Every structure is written in structure tokens, then in C-alpha cells.
Regions:
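Strand-loop microenvironment adjacent to phosphate/nucleotide-handling motifs in alpha/beta enzyme folds
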Residues: 4-173
Length: 173
């Protein structure tokens, strides 16, 4: 059985922005933000674990499960609040620098595709929503998986870029 859990950013996990900001604060700044308007959804580690467990229990196969994480958070506001909570004044004591969006990065997170939004509805748990993916050609999918398995490690990136036009790798593998 195959399901997909659609996550926001998991607070406190590796790669989460909070530990990065804390490290940058400890070093005297600046805090780096990719774009002044960028927003992201957040969930805690226990929420992420519950989403996986409950989605597994609710799944029939092929669904997409999404946790209601409330409103997206503006990363710039998060940086400014963290600076203030640390006893500093943003842009006076600790600067914030904008680094620019990375390849493939979006200003606004999309937890489900537009085509998946039409069918989204609550589950028995009010914080978990479920939807169905768009039509998938199973034979074509299996063919693509077999092709990827037979490729040399460096060749799969080009193939993925053909399959997913919005996929933009940020560095060479």
C-alpha cells in the first residue's frame, strides 16, 4: 500500500530554520532569509509523527494526507521575533540578510497540487485532511521506475528534470 503525507517544516528537525537562526544568533548574526515575502507551514515533531501514524491507520491506499498547520508563517517575521526574544533589536543589533531564492524554491508552499484541492476533505481527525492524487497511469509509472533503477547514478537527475518540469536541483550530485 502506498500513501503520501504532505509535511510542512518540522520544527527542531535537521534542516529546520530555527536551529539555523539560533546558530546565526550565537555567532552574532546576520540571520539569513531567502526572500522578505517567503512563507512556510510548520509542525512539531510530535505532530509529524502523529500524522504518519494516523495516516497509516486511515489509509486505504493511494491517498494524500495533509495536516492542518494553520496559517503559513512569514520567515522574515520569525527571524525578527527570534532576534527580539534573544534580547536584541532586529537591523540594529542583529542584521537580516536576504540571500535570494534557491533554484526551484517557491515563495509560498503548496502542500497539495491544484488538481488535488478539488477532492480534499477532513478525516475523523479534524486536523488531518485527505485527498486523492490526479490520474496516474500505473503502467507509465512502473516503466519510469524501472528506467530509473537501470540508470547510472548521475543520469537520473536529467531524467527527473524531464519528468518533473518544476524540479530544479540546487547543486550537482
Amino acid at each position: 500500500m502506498c500513501i503520501r503525507d504532505s509535511f510542512g517544516n518540522v520544527l527542531g528537525s535537521n534542516g529546520s530554520v530555527i536551529p539555523l537562526f539560533k546558530e546565526q544568533l550565537e555567532n552574532g548574526g546576520p540571520l539569513t532569509v531567502t526572500h522578505p515575502d517567503i512563507t512556510r507551514y510548520f509542525m512539531t515533531i510530535p505532530e509529524a509523527a502523529q500524522l504518519v501514524v494516523q495516516a497509516g491507520g486511515l489509509a486505504k491506499g493511494g491517498e494524500i494526507f495533509v495536516l492542518n498547520m494553520g496559517e503559513p508563517v512569514k520567515i522574515l517575521s520569525l527571524a525578527e521575533k527570534l532576534i527580539k526574544l534573544s534580547g536584541f533589536e532586529p537591523y540594529v543589533d542583529i542584521d537580516i540578510q536576504f540571500t535570494g531564492l534557491r533554484p526551484g524554491e517557491k515563495l509560498y508552499e503548496e502542500l497539495v497540487l491544484q488538481s488535488e484541492k478539488d477532492d480534499i476533505h477532513k478525516t475523523q481527525n479534524d486536523k488531518i485532511y485527505v485527498t486523492s492524487p490526479g490520474d496516474i497511469d500505473d503502467e507509465k509509472l512502473i516503466s519510469h521506475i524501472e528506467k530509473i533503477r537501470s540508470m547510472k547514478p548521475g543520469d537520473s537527475r536529467e531524467f527527473l528534470m524531464e519528468l518533473v518540469p518544476t524540479y530544479t536541483p540546487d547543486r550537482e550530485a
